[in-house]
Amino acid sequence: MEAVVLERSIVVKADRERVWRAITTPEHITKWFEPIRFERLAVGEALTFSWNGEGSIALVEPMDRFGFRWQIAPPHPAQTLVVFVLETVPEGTRITMTEQGFEALPDEVRQARFKDNTQGWEHMLGELIAYLTSREP
């Protein structure tokens, strides 16, 4: 089966360091995404989401790329991989978010989760822009 990838890109008027903190620090993530817990920013570190979902940190390249895996359709064990890539642009920072791995889900679940996550990321990236353009991070 062909890979199913969700991709969105936004540009925000914030420097990379500020964006990096917002996407990799639990106290900041909670402000724009949802409550999430982890102890260390390290590959393999377990993540716990507010809805009792679980995952793990999959990629840490400071100031450049951050990724995590999460189970998006419990009880189905498949996990998708979410990756944020940061790039400095004249307007601030471009954030490109991809989520892949949907093809591991059964057809009916895959279609529903892809649609839900597409809408969800549109909303969450809007929340991230709002958070980054506030005074907080």
Which role fits each region the language model picked out?
Residues 1-38:
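Hydrophobic ligand-binding cavity/cleft-lining segments
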Residues 19, 29, 57, 66-68, ...:
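Hydrophobic pocket/interface hotspot
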Residues 20-23, 32, 51, 68-70, ...:
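Tryptophan-centric aromatic hotspots in well-structured domains and transmembrane helices
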Residues 38, 48-94, 100-103:
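Hydrophobic-ligand binding "helix-grip"
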Residues 101-137:
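A conserved amphipathic terminal alpha-helix motif
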